[in-house]
């Protein structure tokens, strides 16, 4: 309920104010016989700035901390460097356009559009992108490939309010031309989210789990033009299949266009907010 105390007051605008957000990243895969796991631990600070209504700039750098991998994984390299524009149309239709350098060594442009019902339980939409290869190499420095690859998907999401469950279904074309279907089931606990997923693409099956947890310092206030803060959440996903044709053909590959993509950040489902506020009110009454 504390979040509602200042609901009637106008927020301080954050346009053209800069945040330095410190993200952490863990890469962990079991796909070799000579080592139990290949791993990489990185710190990924990002400068984030709201430019105007719906507009945002992100500039991120990846700083390796520890790894048993070689090549690019040991080098300081660019992370997400992007400009994005969110637009809300009439009749609960939302759009987003992003251009720049993304995760998984991709650069290019992506368009997202979705429709949300009045109660927020159903979402239907689509995503389309055109990206090329981007990497830091010893020979070429920052290499930018010219070949573009098309990815696209149709997406559906449903929120079940009684159990606080979110179901997501996505069908489409992944980065390297394979076609597949992915389903996710996520349980929300306050600001925590944990879920399972299954993916079938080009006849290969994969699955795993993902979670997002809030980090201390998430509610740091802003006192000037520049603010340094930790990331709001730590998110991680694990897939069971890490070898064979699934890896050799790079099946099911996708990318993120913003550093804070996870199942908790920007989850503003009306039924869940109502449920969460009722629990907070009951706690205050019981004191």
What are these regions (language model features)?
Residues 20-33, 57-67, 83, 90-102, ...:
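Transmembrane beta-strand segments that form the barrel wall of outer-membrane beta-barrel proteins
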Residues 1-83, 145, 279, 284-287:
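Outer-membrane beta-barrel initiation region
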Residues 41-52, 76-89, 108-128, 150-160, ...:
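Feature captures outer-membrane beta-barrel proteins of Gram-negative bacteria and organelles
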Residues 1-8, 135, 144-145, 151, ...:
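Flexible, glycine-rich linker and terminal segments associated
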Residues 31-40, 51-53, 64-77, 99-109, ...:
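Solvent-exposed loop/turn segments connecting transmembrane beta-strands
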Residues 1-2, 19-26, 42-48, 56, ...:
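Outer-membrane beta-barrel proteins and related beta-barrel translocases across Gram-negative bacteria
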Residues 10-19, 52-58, 88-94, 118-124, ...:
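Short loop/turn motifs that connect adjacent beta-strands in outer-membrane beta-barrel proteins
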